[in-house]
Amino acid sequence: TFTTSRGAVSANKVYGTTASNILIFVEAGEEGTDDWTAFGQSFDQDVYSNVTSMWGSPPDTDSNGKVVVLYSKFSTSHINSGFAGYFDSKDLFENESGSNGADMVHMNLYRTTDTRYTPDSTKDTLAHEMQHLIQYGYRHIDRNFSLMDTWMSEGLAECAAHFALNKALTNSIAYYKSDPDGYFRNGFPLIKWHGIAADYVLTYLFFQYIRLHATDGTNIYPQIMQTSTGDYQSIETVMKNQNSEFPTFGDLLLKFTVANLINGDDIYGYGNERTSFDMSSPPAPTSVSGVNLYSGGIMYVYTTAETVNSFSPSGQGTNISYIKVNKE
């Protein structure tokens, strides 16, 4: 029996051997017809090795050398609770109330009331949650660092999902480009976390952008995780040694902003992956007034080249930047 966000859940082991890196449990009666053995072997051999080779080993507080993965219903009515998985740090501390006393992550069985996740469709989420487990173990248990800012923690976890699948998260890119809710064109911030899909999309793009312009490529991710500050200064510290274009975090934000506007083949774009991260169609202009901008928020105003060339900003201050861009 496990403790979950829903309460106590009885579960049966469907995958795990003495040689495996993970143990998979599924809520009793919900095993279905899925081939859990094939999924477990695939995750063990491919995804687990990808995640741990990049981020390091997970903690092993229960001394069994394995990560426990529990698939259960997040709601008794099968209605999706809004997320596909989670990591709960209290599971690592046996004496905490509600702890499972195990290195584990929790996965949702149901996408909607009538639609069940297939195991293969959860690989990216499982990698995401495992990165949270590894990150917490390294920063909080091994080093006693402060917890990382949420937007960064989630951005690094989305990177784990990207490399678990070994491809770009196309749904995230499509969401950014279509901007169906008008978030991005109306000042949605990178750094202020709201806990909605737009947050994950924006921080995912940001961390892919910096990877593509870093000398060390994917190796910057563990470097950022292992930097003690755990905020934007961690990124600044790492990136200013990776590319002379980014002496400050402000420079990084500015160039990331322009990259999402013009899709260049240099620093103002996504480098040799600009086809995957295709930003060639400009975002829609800002559609609301009276926007409160937070760190990383952007507003787009389209006008004539003549107006752009003659524009002189006023009231700019130190925290708001005007960027004039001629796409021609």
Which residues are covered by each model-predicted region?
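Acidic/polar low-complexity interaction segments
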Residues: 1-31
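Ordered hydrophobic segments in well-structured contexts
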Residues: 14-15, 21-26, 68-70, 104-108, ...
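Juxtacatalytic substrate-recognition/specificity segment
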Residues: 20-149, 156, 166-170
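Non-transmembrane alpha-helical segments in soluble domains
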Residues: 40, 48, 52, 127, ...
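Acidic/His/Gly-enriched intrinsically disordered linker/tail segments
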Residues: 100, 120, 140-214, 225-260
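Short, solvent-exposed segments of well-ordered alpha helices
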Residues: 121, 148, 194, 198, ...
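Beta/coil-rich, acidic/histidine-enriched accessory regions frequently appended to metallopeptidases
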Residues: 230-328
